C-alpha cells in the first residue's frame, strides 16, 4: 500500500507565476517552456504563421522540437525536449474522442523524432489552463516533480520526497491525493482536477519506457492510466530526472475551446453520439469489447501474430476472442478516458489477483488489454490464458514499459530459445518456452529491478539480434530475419507478409513500424479494398494524411475508424469515408 503524502512533504525548489488566459477559437496562442535543469518556466508566443502551417498537436510538437534541437542532438542530451501538444479541438466535450494529446521527442530507440498519441485528462487540463503545448527541456540534478496549477496560476518545482513510490499505479495515486490540496485527498471533485504524467522504474533500465497519463475514476475511487507508448519517451523523462509532471484544472465546460459556432459543434457531435449508440452493437462492439474485438477477426484471416509473427493463426485463437474479453471487462462502469466520449472503449478488468512479482496476491484494476497488448503478449508468445495477458499488461503499465515492444521482443527471445540460441545459463534460469507467461513476467520483473537477464532483454530486438550473433555465434542473417523492428522500434501486432500495403505502412514511415499512420491491414486483407498496386500506393498517401489530421486536431481516430455510417457501403469509394471493417462481423464465427 502507498502512504499518504501531503504537500509539506515536498521540498519546494522554485516557483514561477503566470497570468491565466482564456482559449479563443481553439487556441491560447502561447506555449509553456519548462527547463527542469534551470528550474524555470517561460511563456512562448504562437505566431499566426505557426498556427496556419502546423495547426496543433503533432504539428506543434514537431515544430517546437525542431526549434529546440540541432542535427547532432541525441535523445539523452539536455536540449532534447518532450513536447506535449494539444490541437484546437482537444477537450471539446461535445465531440466523442476529443481528449487526445500528442507527445513528441527524440526517441532512444530510433534516434529520430517520435510522436505518440495518448488519452486521459492531462492534455485537456493543460489546454484549458491557457496553453497550446508544454515543452520539457534540460536535466534536473535531483529527482524533480513539476506542478502546473492552472487554477491558481503558477508552476512549482519540487524535490521528490523519500519514500515516494516508483510504480505507476501507486505513484499516480500518491501524487493525485497530495496535489489535490490539504484536506482534499478524499474529495472526488478535487481528485478529478488532477492529472499526472509519470514513467515507471522500468524506464530507468530500458529504451522502451512509456509515459503514463493518469485520470481519477470517480466510480472506482482510483487511478487509471493511458499510455503514450511508442518510441521510449518515458525513458527520456526518467533520463531528465523528472519523477512526474502534475497538472491541476477545474471548470471544464461544453465550449471551453471557444468554438466559433458552438451550436454547430453541438449539433454535429450529437449526430455522431447517436450513430455510435445506434451502430456500435451491430458493428465492432467497441463500447463492450474495445479494440480487443479484433482478436478473432485477425485470427480468422491469418493476420494474428503467433509465435513471433511466424504464423497468423492458431486453433486456440477462440480462447482469446472478443467475447472472452467482454466477459472479463467491467461492463457496469463507464470507461471513457475523457468526458463526453460515447465510445467509452478504454475498458478495464477490476479485482484481478496478481500471481507474480512484488504485488503477488493483491487485487488490482488492469487497464485493458487493448488489441495490441492481447496480441503482443498473448498469441505472439503463444499465451492463450487471459490471466497471463492481464498480468503482463498490468506490470508493463506500472513499470512503464511499452506492451508492443515488450511483446515483440519477448517473442523474439522465445524463438531464440526454441532455436537453441538461448539456454538456461544465458537467461539466468528463466524458461522461455512458448506459452510460458510466467517466464515472460520474470523478465519484466528483472528489467524493472535492473538486474539479471531482464537488463539485457530490455535493450530491444535490434540490439539483441546483433548481440546474439556476435556473442553467442548465432547466424547473423537468421537473427536479422526474426528480429521484427525498423530503425530499432519493434513492429506492432499485425502479420503483414501478404499485405504490401501494410508493409509499406510499417516500413515507409519516418518514425518506425507502428500502426498509427497507415493502418491498412484491414482495408487490404479483410475487406479487399486495395486490389491493385495503384490502389495500395494511393492508400499509403491518403490514409496517413487523414490519420495525421486527427493528431493535429486533438481527436481520437477510433470514433471514425470503428463506426461507419449505416449507409456507407452505398457510396463510391466507401473505404475513403470509412475503412468499412464492420461488415466483416457477419463472416466471423461467434460462440453458440
Outline where the language-model segments fall.
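Protein-protein interaction/assembly regions in multi-subunit complexes
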Residues: 2-230, 234, 239-254, 259-280, ...
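Hydrophobic alpha-helical segments, chiefly the membrane-spanning helices
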Residues: 588-592
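Extended C-terminal regions of large enzymes
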Residues: 98-100, 176, 180-197, 201-587
Amino acid at each position: 500500500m502507498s502512504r499518504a503524502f501531503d504537500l509539506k512533504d515536498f521540498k519546494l525548489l522554485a516557483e514561477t507565476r503566470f497570468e491565466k488566459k482564456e482559449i479563443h477559437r481553439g487556441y491560447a496562442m502561447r506555449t509553456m517552456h519548462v527547463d527542469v535543469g534551470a528550474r524555470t518556466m517561460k511563456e512562448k508566443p504562437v505566431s499566426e504563421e505557426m498556427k496556419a502551417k502546423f495547426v496543433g498537436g503533432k504539428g506543434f510538437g514537431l515544430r517546437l522540437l525542431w526549434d529546440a534541437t540541432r542535427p547532432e542532438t541525441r535523445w539523452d542530451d539536455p536540449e532534447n525536449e518532450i513536447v506535449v501538444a494539444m490541437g484546437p479541438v482537444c477537450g471539446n466535450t461535445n465531440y466523442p474522442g476529443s481528449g487526445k494529446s500528442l507527445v513528441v521527442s527524440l526517441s532512444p530507440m530510433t534516434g529520430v523524432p517520435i510522436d505518440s498519441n495518448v488519452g486521459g485528462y492531462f492534455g485537456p487540463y493543460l489546454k484549458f489552463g491557457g496553453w497550446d503545448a508544454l515543452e520539457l527541456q534540460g536535466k534536473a540534478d535531483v529527482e524533480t516533480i513539476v506542478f502546473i496549477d492552472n487554477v491558481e496560476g503558477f508552476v512549482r518545482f519540487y524535490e521528490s520526497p523519500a519514500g515516494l513510490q516508483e510504480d505507476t499505479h501507486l505513484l499516480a495515486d500518491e501524487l493525485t491525493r497530495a496535489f489535490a490540496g490539504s484536506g482534499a485527498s478524499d474529495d472526488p471533485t478535487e481528485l478529478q482536477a488532477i492529472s499526472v504524467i509519470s514513467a515507471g522504474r522500468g524506464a530507468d533500465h530500458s529504451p522502451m519506457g512509456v509515459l503514463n497519463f493518469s485520470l481519477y475514476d470517480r466510480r472506482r475511487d482510483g487511478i487509471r492510466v493511458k499510455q503514450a507508448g511508442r518510441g521510449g519517451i518515458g525513458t527520456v523523462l526518467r533520463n531528465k530526472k523528472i519523477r512526474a509532471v502534475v497538472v491541476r484544472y477545474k471548470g471544464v465546460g461544453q465550449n471551453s475551446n471557444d468554438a466559433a459556432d458552438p451550436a454547430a459543434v453541438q449539433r454535429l457531435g450529437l449526430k455522431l453520439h447517436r450513430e455510435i449508440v445506434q451502430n456500435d452493437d451491430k458493428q465492432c462492439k467497441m463500447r463492450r469489447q474495445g479494440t480487443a474485438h479484433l482478436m478473432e477477426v485477425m485470427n480468422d484471416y491469418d493476420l494474428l501474430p503467433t509465435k513471433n509473427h511466424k504464423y497468423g493463426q492458431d486453433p486456440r485463437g477462440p480462447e482469446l476472442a472478443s467475447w472472452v474479453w467482454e466477459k472479463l471487462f467491467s461492463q457496469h462502469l463507464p470507461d471513457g478516458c475523457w468526458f463526453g466520449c460515447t465510445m467509452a472503449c478504454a475498458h478495464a478488468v477490476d479485482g484481478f489477483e496478481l500471481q507474480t512479482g512484488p504485488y503477488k496476491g493483491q487485487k488490482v484494476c488492469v487497464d485493458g488489454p487493448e488489441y495490441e497488448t492481447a496480441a503482443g503478449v498473448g498469441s505472439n508468445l503463444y499465451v492463450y490464458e487471459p490471466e497471463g495477458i492481464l498480468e503482463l499488461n498490468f506490470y508493463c503499465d506500472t513499470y512503464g514499459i511499452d506492451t508492443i515492444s515488450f511483446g515483440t521482443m519477448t517473442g523474439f527471445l522465445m524463438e531464440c530459445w526454441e532455436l537453441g540460441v538461448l539456454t538456461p545459463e544465458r537467461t539466468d534460469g528463466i524458461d522461455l518456452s512458448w506459452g510460458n507467461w510466467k517466464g515472460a513476467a520474470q523478465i519484466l520483473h528483472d528489467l524493472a529491478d535492473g538486474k539479471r537477464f531482464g537488463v539485457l532483454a530490455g535493450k530491444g530486438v535490434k540490439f539483441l539480434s546483433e548481440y546474439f550473433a556476435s556473442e553467442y555465434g548465432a547466424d547473423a542473417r537468421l537473427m536479422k530475419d526474426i528480429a521484427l523492428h525498423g530503425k530499432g522500434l519493434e513492429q506492432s501486432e499485425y502479420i503483414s507478409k501478404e499485405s504490401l500495403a501494410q508493409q509499406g505502412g510499417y516500413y515507409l514511415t519516418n518514425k518506425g513500424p507502428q500502426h498509427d499512420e497507415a493502418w491498412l491491414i484491414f482495408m487490404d486483407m479483410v475487406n479487399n479494398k486495395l486490389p491493385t498496386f495503384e490502389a495500395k500506393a494511393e492508400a499509403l498517401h491518403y490514409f496517413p494524411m487523414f490519420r495525421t489530421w486527427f493528431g493535429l486536431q486533438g481527436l481520437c481516430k477510433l470514433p471514425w475508424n470503428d463506426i461507419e455510417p449505416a449507409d456507407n457501403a452505398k457510396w463510391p469509394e466507401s473505404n475513403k469515408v470509412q475503412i468499412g471493417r464492420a461488415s466483416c462481423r457477419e463472416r466471423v464465427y461467434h460462440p453458440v
